[in-house]
């Protein structure tokens, strides 16, 4: 996911007793966003990220939907979502604790190239969204914990790269090229929503771009992406809002610039998709770069 900003960081959302969600960034990975959370009731609305989502379940079970499948992620599982994979999430069997990171395509390709020596390698693809791998889970969890605590930047940096290499070497197909770059009618509609997310687009705009009738467009769009055109537009707006928050813009200004009616609308959409709200809080960045500021 796109990271948070100093002065306009993403603060913890109001959760039920015993729940928490903490979003932080790893400075040594150019602001790589990380999440540590425990949920017993909170559910995520369907959403997508510009980045991968790679993480592990520490305890409990998460029920989620992705790639047209109903999935269960349990203790010791590794979880993989590709960029723009639409997914949701809900507690199952009493709730769950998990750690998650949101690496860019460039970072995952960098690790894949170091494993294979092939600089022409495509976008790493994980055939299974969830795999049982206690050893890989422990490796990832320890690196994530070190990054969160911020005590030893080099250890966290090395550990996370080792964890990503483990995931790629054991669970990824490195021969797949250009995930999500199809050029069909739905791709054309998605491109318009990505480009003009701050406008009040109509179905007529999307039909002109895609060449599909309105009723066909809605059904086909949902079948291919998992979201209706409107839900996809809101998701794009949230992703672009996070980019602006990272640059230090205020939530009110960000809401106006990204097509939301007001800050309250932004907050509701943000919370539903990401588990945290945009708010004024002191950002904690992990790594030597930011520790030197204190």
PLM ranges: what are they?
Residues 11-12, 19-121:
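N-terminal regulatory/effector-sensing and dimerization cores
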Residues 283-290:
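Conserved small/polar residues in nucleotide/adenosyl-binding loops
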Residues 142-152, 163-174, 189-202, 221, ...:
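Basic, amphipathic alpha-helical hairpins
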Residues 194, 199-236, 243-246, 255-280:
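Basic/polar phosphate-binding segments, predominantly the helix-turn-helix DNA-binding elements
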């Amino acid at each position: 996911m796109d990271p948070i900003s100093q002065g306009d960081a993403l603060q913890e959302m109001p959760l039920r007793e015993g729940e928490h969600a903490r979003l932080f960034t790893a400075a040594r990975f150019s602001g790589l966003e990380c999440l540590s959370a425990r949920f017993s009731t909170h559910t995520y609305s369907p959403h997508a990220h510009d980045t991968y989502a790679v993480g592990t379940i520490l305890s409990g079970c998460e029920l989620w939907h992705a790639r047209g499948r109903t999935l269960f992620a349990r203790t010791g599982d590794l979880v993989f979502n590709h960029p723009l994979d639409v997914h949701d999430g809900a507690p199952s069997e009493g709730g769950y604790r998990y750690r998650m990171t949101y690496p860019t395509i460039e970072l995952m390709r960098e690790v894949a190239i170091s494993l294979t020596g092939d600089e022409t390698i495509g976008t790493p693809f994980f055939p299974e969204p969830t795999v049982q791998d206690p050893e890989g889970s422990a490796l990832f969890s320890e690196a994530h914990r070190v990054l969160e605590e911020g005590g030893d930047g080099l250890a966290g940096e090395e550990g996370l790269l080792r964890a990503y290499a483990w995931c790629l070497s054991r669970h990824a197909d490195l021969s797949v090229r250009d995930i999500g770059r199809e050029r069909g009618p739905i791709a054309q509609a998605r491109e318009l929503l990505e480009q003009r997310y701050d406008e009040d687009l109509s179905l007529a705009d999307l039909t002109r771009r895609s060449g599909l009738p309105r009723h066909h467009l809605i059904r086909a769009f949902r079948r291919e992406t998992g979201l209706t055109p409107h839900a996809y537009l809101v998701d794009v707006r949230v992703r672009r809002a996070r980019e602006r928050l990272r640059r230090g813009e205020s939530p009110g200004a960000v809401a106006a610039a990204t097509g939301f009616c007001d800050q309250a609308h932004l907050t509701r959409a943000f919370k539903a998709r990401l588990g945290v709200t945009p708010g004024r809080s002191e950002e904690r960045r992990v790594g030597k770069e930011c520790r030197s500021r204190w």
